[in-house]
């Protein structure tokens, strides 16, 4: 029954954080719902809702308007503004959903891991991926990258392993096969 509860744990199903059974098994057995935990959960949930509804949705609406401009109506500055707005919209969308899931979990006595750690202040691409959808990166590392040999293989296989994880991460985030093969949706 504990495993069934884990499988059906709705707060983290939609956008993460990805919680492994081993990490939540003890919490299922001995979780405690407290007023303080419920309050912290409400704070996380509200923060996530603000990120999603106020920031992500608004930025997305502005981006759609910029994207609808013709080449004559648009400039390089407008295109760059659109690109920045889109990256911020994606961040606020994903991290908002994650914060709402963390908050709901906390309200029910669970402690889910943080999923985003300010990725846009990263100092390198590697640092960015360590901060972006962290539980997904951990999952792909443990269940795909390491079983393929990780970086303890030849350079060619290491590159292959990185490309496989990169491609699967794209699929996870909604990129279809056409996008992966031809950069088209």
Question: What annotation goes with each model-predicted range?
Answer:
Residues 1-184:
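Membrane-embedded transmembrane alpha-helical bundles that form the catalytic cores
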């Amino acid at each position: 029954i504990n495993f069934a509860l884990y499988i059906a744990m709705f707060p983290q199903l939609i956008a993460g954080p990805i919680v492994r059974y081993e990490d939540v098994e003890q919490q299922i057995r001995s979780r405690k719902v407290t007023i303080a935990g419920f309050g912290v959960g409400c704070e996380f949930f509200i923060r996530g809702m603000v990120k999603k509804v106020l920031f992500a949705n608004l930025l997305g609406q502005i981006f759609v308007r910029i994207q609808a401009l013709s080449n004559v109506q648009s400039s390089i500055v407008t295109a760059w503004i659109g690109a920045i707005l889109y990256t911020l919209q994606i961040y606020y969308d994903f991290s908002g959903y994650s914060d709402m899931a963390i908050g709901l979990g906390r309200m029910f006595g669970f402690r889910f891991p943080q999923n985003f750690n300010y990725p846009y202040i990263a100092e390198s691409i590697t640092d960015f991926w360590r901060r972006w959808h962290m539980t997904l990166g951990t999952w792909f590392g443990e269940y795909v990258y390491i079983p393929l040999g990780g970086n303890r293989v030849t350079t060619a296989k290491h590159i292959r392993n990185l490309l496989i994880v990169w491609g699967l991460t794209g699929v996870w985030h909604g990129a279809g096969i056409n996008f992966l093969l031809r950069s088209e949706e």
